Amino acid sequence: MKLLHSIKAHDDKVWSLSSHPTLPLLATASTDKCSNIYRLSCSNASSSSSSSSPPSPPSPPSSSSPRRNFPQIAHLEDTHRRSVRSVSFKPPMGGIDHQDSNILDLPALASGSFDSTISIWGIDEPDDDNTYEIEEIIANQKEFLASPGNEWNLMAVIEGHENEIKAVDWNFSGRYLASCSRDKTVWIWETDPETLEEFECVAVLTDHTQDVKHVTWHPTRNLLASSSYDDTIRVYKQEFDDDEWSCVGMIDGHEGTVWCSKFESPKSPKAKDGTTRLVSVSDDLSARVWASKDNTGFNGGSEQLQSQSQTHLPSSIRHNAEEMVWEQESTLPQIHTHAIYSVAWSSSSGKIATAGSDGRIVVYKETNAGWEVENIQESAHGVYEINCVIWAKLDLDQEVLISGGDDGNVNIWEV
């Protein structure tokens, strides 16, 4: 692993990171009650050009402005009274694979806080000032929407949880936002992904018996996993009529707090048709991969994506609240010596990365013989613990690994 860049993002702990699925944007969450947004650009990948200040409004791709290493483009503050614990970018409307390139899809960010609220942030549609035609902006969204010239504004504050929010995550289409809390509940909020004007609570899930640490959506399905201090993972999906959410599986193989879990993307090189896989990490020092066979098809609600690479039964013969049977497929080689706080599963390479309180980052790759260690980065944040690790892509589509730690730094790694 090679350290490409280190950002001194905050003066206090970095709790969470989120990269936008299609734009070169990175968001951070910190104990300092703020979130920052950075552009995922690296000058090492471009030639030098004339020096000038970035124009405003945003410049099109043909601009001769020099590229900077991961410039900060927004500082979101004065909203939360306590730590911002989690951030999550809203995916494009309809999902990454069904994005309409003919509409302007503005980015939005959800931030969950220890003050028990969620804030929603976004940018306004560029004004028609005759500088650029809207068609030009739509055609070059990657440049315009990730520009420092955009002002990020508070769009909504969501209330409902009784205690600290530990995680937030959007579903694949941006229609649903999930949140979890120390109050032992998981909430699902529904909104119009185009306007984000209202957020209606459509489910309060109370299956966990202790603090819920993390929630994560499947990349292409309305399938939600929650991880808890009660040592279990719960899996939820919609009933056939889309009005109810049910717990359809419980994974109880860990012997300590489950801090984080992530679904495998159907795009992963090792993904198999008819099998859903999930990786989880825990206080018990283990990272485990779980698998569930979709023998009777999958009822993921009206938004269920039906990719050509997957086989699903017609909705007319699917069963409501069909139980998912999860089996432990493998335990990754144990490297960590203290609690593992975060795990990320790359949709491009299929690699899994883990990080935690021992300061290590471990990267695993799957072979025909099973999972093996590819990289170990000791003291990735010096003597500090690592709270989050994610896979992301730079603006030139290079995949990187990004970590956030107690030192307030965000480190970008080439793997």
UniProtKB/Swiss-Prot annotation:
GO terms for cellular component: cytosolic [4Fe-4S] assembly targeting complex; nucleus. This is Probable cytosolic iron-sulfur protein assembly protein 1. The gene is CIA1. One of its GO terms (biological process) is iron-sulfur cluster assembly. Keywords: Cytoplasm, Nucleus, Repeat, WD repeat. PANTHER family: CYTOSOLIC IRON-SULFUR PROTEIN ASSEMBLY PROTEIN CIAO1-RELATED, WD40 PROTEIN CIAO1. It is found in: Cytoplasm; Nucleus. WD repeats lie at residues 9-48, 79-131, 160-200, 207-246, 253-300, 335-374, 380-415. Interacts with NAR1. Its main location: cytoplasm.
